[in-house]
């Protein structure tokens, strides 16, 4: 399931340092020559494709990125130090476009690929550069050149790591809005979500995963009922399914266990492989259940549902239990990503030998 994640950033390479006007001052040497050094180059801005990243969420929290300016030249023929470069880590597949013209500037398609996206300004010349046979004591210098400045649009086609599964009005949209930057339409009636919504859950710096809120399922969805199998196919490429169940339906005649079993039947009818995909049970709306009855209700549900996998109890509205859930999801997603990476072939000629065991006397 692919969606487009985007972010806008302003980048500025460093300005070059100015040249220096200086003359040599030595004992017994009345007219020392020019010795003003050049200014240092401004820092460059690079972008590198990092295989460990899968979203652009970090760039929404830090939009402006500036490299350091080069230092000014000094006397005694000393050139100014160059400004420090900065490297922006981006997910593989990121497209960098000029936000003003729409021109595609770069595409990061290869893991580890590094491109120069803003060039630092060159340093200015010191007066040593202007010495000639007719001008023995030049007092000229030039300022440093400004670094490049750009407004960039970053685009990334992202694959959802986690798919939300459940009946209409189970609280999926509330959950995704509570843990991510997505803002789906939320209301107290079925089929509020008419299109898949994508949310990026930020666990920490350079730590995030993608979750998809799909339209709710009803019995017969595998044959196209309700919003149908159009959205069931979106779940096939996710790494984890969260089956969200409403523990406190408004209609007292509705049995949450029966609804949950109907969802599982639809999964199995549609695709056996989808049914076998890792699936966690998330019991939602605990804030609407009496605290004294929670444990008994949860125990009864799990027993009747006959679920053997991980079970989480949350309230998407109050965020109770959400923090633990998203950290556990992130750990699972990273493990799956690691297992999906191809094993590097090692030339047997260069395999290190195991250390020799010490000889026993």
From Swiss-Prot:
Its EC number is 3.6.5.-. GO terms for molecular function: GTP binding; GTPase activity; magnesium ion binding. An essential GTPase which binds GTP, GDP and possibly (p)ppGpp with moderate affinity, with high nucleotide exchange rates and a fairly low GTP hydrolysis rate. Plays a role in control of the cell cycle, stress response, ribosome biogenesis and in those bacteria that undergo differentiation, in morphogenesis control. Its cofactor is Mg(2+). Residues 160-334 form the OBG-type G domain. Mg(2+) binds at residues 173, 193. Pfam families: GTP1_OBG, MMR_HSR1. SUPFAM superfamilies: Obg GTP-binding protein N-terminal domain, P-loop containing nucleoside triphosphate hydrolases. Residues 339-361 are annotated as: Disordered. CDD domains: Obg (cd01898). It comes from the Bacteria. GO terms for biological process: ribosome biogenesis. It is found in: Cytoplasm. GO terms for cellular component: cytoplasm. The lineage of its organism: Bacteria, Pseudomonadati, Pseudomonadota, Betaproteobacteria, Burkholderiales. This is GTPase Obg.
């Amino acid at each position: 399931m692919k969606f487009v994640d985007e972010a806008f950033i302003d980048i500025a390479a460093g300005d070059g340092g100015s040249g220096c006007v200086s003359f040599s001052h030595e004992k017994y040497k009345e007219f020392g020559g020019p010795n003003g050094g050049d200014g240092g180059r401004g820092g460059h801005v690079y972008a590198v494709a990092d295989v460990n990243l899968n979203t652009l969420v970090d760039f929404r929290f830090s939009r402006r990125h500036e490299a350091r300016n080069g230092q000014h030249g000094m006397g005694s023929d000393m050139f100014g130090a160059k400004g420090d470069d900065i490297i922006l880590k981006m997910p593989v597949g990121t497209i960098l476009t000029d936000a003003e013209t729409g021109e595609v500037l770069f595409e990061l398609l290869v893991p580890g690929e590094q491109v120069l996206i803003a060039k630092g300004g060159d340093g200015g010349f010191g007066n040593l550069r202007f010495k000639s046979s007719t001008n023995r004591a030049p007092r000229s210098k030039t300022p440093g050149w400004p670094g490049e400045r750009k407004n960039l649009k970053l685009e990334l086609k992202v694959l959802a790591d986690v798919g939300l599964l459940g009946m209409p009005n189970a609280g999926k949209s509330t959950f995704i809005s509570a843990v991510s930057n997505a803002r789906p339409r939320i209301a107290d009636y079925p089929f509020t979500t008419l299109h898949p919504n994508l949310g990026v859950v930020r666990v920490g710096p350079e730590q995030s995963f993608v979750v998809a809120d799909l339209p709710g399922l009803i019995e017969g969805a595998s044959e196209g009922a309700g919003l149908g199998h159009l959205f069931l196919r979106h779940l096939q490429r996710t790494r984890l399914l969260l089956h969200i169940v409403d523990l406190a339906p408004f209609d007292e005649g509705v049995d949450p266990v029966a609804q949950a079993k109907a969802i599982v039947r639809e999964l199995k009818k549609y695709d056996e492989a989808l049914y076998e995909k890792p699936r966690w049970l998330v019991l939602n709306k605990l804030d609407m259940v009496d605290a004294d009855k929670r444990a008994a209700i949860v125990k009864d549900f799990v027993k009747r549902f006959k679920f053997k996998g991980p079970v989480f109890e949350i309230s998407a509205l109050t965020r109770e239990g959400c923090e633990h859930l998203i950290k556990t999801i992130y750990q699972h997603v990273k493990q799956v990503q690691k297992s999906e990476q191809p094993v590097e072939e090692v030339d047997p000629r260069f395999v290190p030998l195991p250390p020799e065991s010490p000889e026993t006397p």
